[in-house]
């Protein structure tokens, strides 16, 4: 989620933890719904549940490497989205989006950033570093805060400074424990934050699926060149490991688009506070999958690092809730004064 302060452009939830942002336009600073719709809550939780279990699915794609996973994901996501747009009768909208010269720069930038994010995510799975992916997405709200400071000139509240300071301490502890900087976690958090920043700073007027399709169209050269290089090196396992493996790889297209659709539907019927809470579902599930299923180790120093991140997020969340409550109170007071 992209949040700095309740009223800032970068403070509005709307980015998914698998690197796809629903283009719903500018969201209001105060939720338009008085309460959360149970159906929307179910849809939102399902979307984050799928994203949280994605590392488990990717682990089943062995012996495919990280580069092949990304290349094939681009290809099958494009196919699935084109079929979906056809069923939705929005193919014309895609043509309009691609024919708008002013959108090419933003679409290309977003596509490039999300390709890097997908690659780092795949690397985290294929190298046994899913815990770093979890750490990266836990850190994402804090990275969004820093992006607001760097690019929007926003000022942090005291609670936000405390949260960022604790997060920095967590990175230091994790670096000492690992003997190196957790570059996968930092790369995921940064690329994901930048992607969300671009999507919210330059919102697209088209449907979320249309926007995602346009981005995958831009990535077609990556798909073509990557497929050729992998085939020449004998590493294109999608077509050499049998039909079962092929369809598992094809499933990446479905898992890219379907959760996005669920999230987009949920975002229209949930408060921003609820969306902000739901975003932690994915990294929590990634953490549990890494430790209990994939067998990644959690020595004491790593527990300390994650503990500091969780403490930082607790401080951050309390600060956000307090700020949101004060804003709603101010809005009600203003409405009462003009009644």
Where are these regions (language model features)?
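Helix-helix packing/entry segments at the starts of transmembrane helices
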Residues: 135-139, 203-218, 257-292
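Membrane-interface interhelical linkers
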Residues: 2-46, 79-107, 158, 206, ...
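C-terminal-most transmembrane helix of multi-pass membrane proteins
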Residues: 2-6, 74, 176, 181, ...
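C-terminal transmembrane-helix exit sites in multi-pass transporters
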Residues: 123, 140-160, 284-303
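Membrane-interface helix termini and inter-helical loops of multi-pass transporters
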Residues: 56-66, 93-95, 126-129, 171-172, ...
């Amino acid at each position: 989620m992209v949040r700095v302060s309740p009223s800032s452009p970068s403070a509005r939830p709307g980015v998914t933890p698998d690197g796809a942002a629903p283009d719903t336009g500018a969201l209001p600073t105060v939720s338009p719904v008085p309460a959360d719709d149970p159906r929307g809550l179910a849809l939102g939780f399902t979307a984050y549940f799928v994203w949280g279990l994605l590392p488990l699915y990717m682990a089943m794609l062995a012996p495919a490497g990280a580069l092949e996973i990304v290349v094939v994901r681009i290809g099958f996501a494009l196919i699935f989205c084109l079929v979906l747009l056809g069923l939705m009768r929005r193919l014309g909208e895609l043509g309009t989006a691609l024919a708008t010269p002013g959108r090419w720069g933003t679409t290309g930038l977003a596509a490039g950033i999300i390709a890097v994010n997908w690659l780092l995510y795949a690397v985290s799975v294929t190298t046994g570093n899913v815990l770093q992916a979890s750490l990266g997405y836990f850190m994402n709200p804090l990275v969004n805060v820093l992006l607001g400071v760097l690019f929007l000139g926003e000022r942090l509240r005291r609670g936000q400074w405390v949260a960022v300071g604790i997060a920095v301490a967590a990175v230091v502890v994790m670096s000492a424990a690992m003997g190196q900087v957790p570059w996968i976690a930092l790369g995921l958090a940064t690329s994901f934050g930048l992607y969300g920043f671009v999507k919210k700073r330059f919102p697209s007027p088209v449907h979320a699926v249309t926007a995602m399709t346009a981005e995958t169209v831009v990535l077609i050269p990556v798909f073509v060149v990557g497929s050729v290089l992998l085939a020449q090196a004998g590493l294109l396992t999608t077509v050499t490991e049998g039909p079962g493996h092929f369809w598992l790889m094809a499933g990446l297209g479905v898992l890219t688009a379907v959760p996005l659709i669920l999230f987009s539907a949920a975002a229209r019927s949930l408060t921003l506070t609820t969306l902000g809470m739901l975003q932690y579902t994915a990294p929590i599930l990634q953490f549990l999958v890494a430790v209990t299923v994939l067998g990644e180790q959690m020595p004491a120093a790593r527990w300390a690092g994650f503990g500091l991140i969780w403490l930082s997020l607790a401080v951050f969340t309390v600060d956000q809730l307090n700020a949101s409550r004060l804003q709603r109170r101010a809005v009600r007071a203003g409405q009462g004064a003009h009644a």
